[in-house]
């Protein structure tokens, strides 16, 4: 990476908050281009690509506070850096989310989303019609951690109702599915899942937040 934002920590935090308030009123096209952007002191026209692994601190005390999580700021690019942070803020705006986490690939995102919601003994329900790599994670990876899996016809709400139990930690589906283009009723399945306390994970890769916002439909 080429450097560090040349501003005080409090100034950076205030600037982020001000930008969030401004961006909330953007139209979708503007959010796509400008959402989450936080320019450095060099006033670049588009998002800078930060390639450094570490960051500089004004003092040992500031560094200690950052690593302890007592104050905001970047510490190591494996956790976060300005480039990824801008991407995450843009996705928050587009999806209407509270938080986001960028990953290196779509399958990394799917794997992280699932593993963060389950533990040994939990249960996951998903449609049979999934992208091959997603299906592999659910059928082959999760069971290695002691997670039970039920695969169903995702277009049949009765099958969702019959599949979820009090051990169901989450449900996962794509809509439209890849590549079969099956459509799952997000609102209805979310209602079914939430009745047993299960989380809802929706792979929105085909529709994108331009055409569909799962969080607004109950996911």
Label every model-predicted segment.
Residues 24-25, 43, 68, 94, ...:
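A generic structural signal for short, solvent-exposed coil/turn residues
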Residues 19-23, 32-38, 100-219:
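Conserved PLP-enzyme active-site core in the AAT-like
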Residues 59-108, 133-140:
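Conserved N-terminal alpha-helix of the aminotransferase class I/II PLP-enzyme fold
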């Amino acid at each position: 990476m080429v450097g560090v934002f040349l501003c005080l920590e409090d100034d950076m935090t205030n600037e982020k908050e001000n930008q969030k308030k401004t961006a909330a009123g953007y139209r979708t096209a503007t959010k796509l281009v400008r959402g989450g952007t936080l320019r450095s002191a060099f006033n670049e026209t588009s998002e800078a690509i930060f390639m450094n692994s570490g960051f500089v601190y004004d003092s040992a005390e500031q560094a200690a506070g950052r690593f302890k999580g007592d104050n905001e700021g970047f510490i190591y690019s494996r956790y976060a850096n300005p480039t990824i942070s801008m991407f995450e803020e843009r996705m928050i705006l587009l999806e209407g989310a509270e938080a986001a986490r960028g990953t290196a690939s779509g399958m990394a995102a799917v794997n992280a989303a699932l593993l963060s919601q389950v533990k040994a003994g939990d249960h996951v329900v998903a449609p049979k019609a999934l992208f091959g790599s997603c299906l592999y994670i659910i059928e082959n990876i999760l069971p290695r951690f002691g997670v039970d899996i039920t695969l169903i016809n995702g277009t049949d709400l009765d099958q969702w109702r019959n599949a979820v139990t009090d051990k169901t930690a989450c449900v996962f589906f794509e809509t439209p599915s890849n590549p079969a283009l099956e459509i799952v009723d997000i609102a209805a399945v979310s209602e079914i899942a939430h009745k047993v306390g299960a989380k809802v994970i929706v792979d929105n890769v085909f529709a994108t937040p331009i055409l569909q916002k799962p969080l607004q439909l109950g996911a």
